[in-house]
Design a protein with these regions (language model features):
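Membrane-water interface regions at transmembrane-helix termini and the short interhelical loops
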Residues: 5-13, 38-53, 73-91, 146-154, ...
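N-terminal alpha-helical transmembrane segments of multi-pass membrane transport
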Residues: 1-140
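Membrane-interface helix-loop-helix junctions at boundaries between adjacent transmembrane segments
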Residues: 121-157, 236-243, 257-279
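Generic hydrophobic alpha-helical membrane-segment signal
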Residues: 97-99, 104, 144-147, 155, ...
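Helix-loop-helix module between adjacent transmembrane segments
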Residues: 10-14, 18-21, 25-35, 68-73, ...
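Membrane-interface loop-to-helix entry segments
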Residues: 22, 53-56, 63-66, 204-212, ...
């Protein structure tokens, strides 16, 4: 009883309410607005997205290419690349294919299934008008080359360079510097202790949680939509809101359960099954 109580108290202390509550409120408000007035949420989201793209698009590109260069060259062709996460005597907890399955299904699984076919067709047909800025005629050989190149840029080395960079930073700080599993901890070597003040760390980690939550929500929505349309195409099951909600609840339950039982019994098995079905 005492150990259980102590464990519960530790769990309660582990929840950073100054991070959880603001992020939860933002997501909850967005969800309520989406239910009450979907068009308003869509318009506001698009305005923010295009504003950020116009204002910080250059920074996105620099950050992306910096991640690719650092991961591909610095970590692979320098002494840093030979460093073993966890110490020189550390052993891998899982085999290569298990890690591969978890990385694939946790990284681009839903996105690549959805956009792996759609995106080349979109660029080939100039649906988004990108070919107009390059002087390429839609439906031509050059358009096909551009479409495939753009799709590979979006879904292969570039995104995984970003994931690898973030993962390596967090892992290095946690295992070698004994820091916390937070984005704030990865910034401490650059900005010093001032970045770890309660206010600064709360703001940074709240924004990080929002980015993760919104990203997961996007992937979840794509997954549900893909499943619903697949059921309609294969079995003639009509699309409906109850079906959409039911699939969403099932996916959330599976994810929550896999998180609760731990990496060994949860994500490892689900990721391996996903990868097996995928291939």
């Amino acid at each position: 009883m005492d150990s259980g109580k102590s464990s519960n108290e530790d769990m309660k202390r582990a929840i950073r309410w100054e991070v959880f509550i603001p992020a939860y409120l933002v997501v909850a408000v967005a969800a309520i607005v989406g239910i009450v007035n979907k068009d308003m949420l869509t318009k506001a989201s698009n305005m923010f997205f295009f504003w950020s793209l116009d204002s910080f698009g250059w920074l996105y590109q620099i950050s992306i290419m910096a991640s690719f260069v650092l991961v591909a060259f610095v970590t692979c062709f320098s002494k840093i690349g030979s460093m073993r996460i966890g110490g020189k005597d550390a052993k891998p907890k899982y085999g290569f294919w298990t890690w591969f399955a978890m990385a694939l299904t946790g990284g681009i699984a839903t996105g690549i299934v959805t956009w792996g076919v759609n995106e080349p067709v979109i660029y080939f047909g100039n649906v988004w008008g990108e070919l107009n800025t390059l002087g390429i005629e839609p439906g031509t050989t050059n358009a096909a080359i551009f479409a495939m190149a753009r799709t590979y840029y979006n879904w292969t080395f570039i995104p995984y360079a970003i994931y690898a960079m973030c993962g390596l930073l967090v892992a290095y700080i946690y295992y070698h510097k004994r820091g916390s599993l937070t984005v704030t901890a990865t910034l401490k070597p650059l900005f010093g202790d001032k970045i770890t003040t309660p206010v600064a760390s709360a703001v940074i980690d709240t924004l990080s949680m929002l980015a993760l939550t919104i990203g997961l929500a996007t992937g979840l929505t794509m997954c549900i939509t893909l499943t619903v349309t697949g059921l309609k195409s294969a079995y003639g099951i009509a699309e409906s809101l109850p079906l959409f909600i039911g699939i969403g609840v099932a996916i959330i339950f599976a994810f929550t359960f896999s998180t609760y039982v731990g990496l060994d019994k949860g994500l490892k098995i689900i990721g391996s099954l996903n990868a097996w079905f995928y291939y």
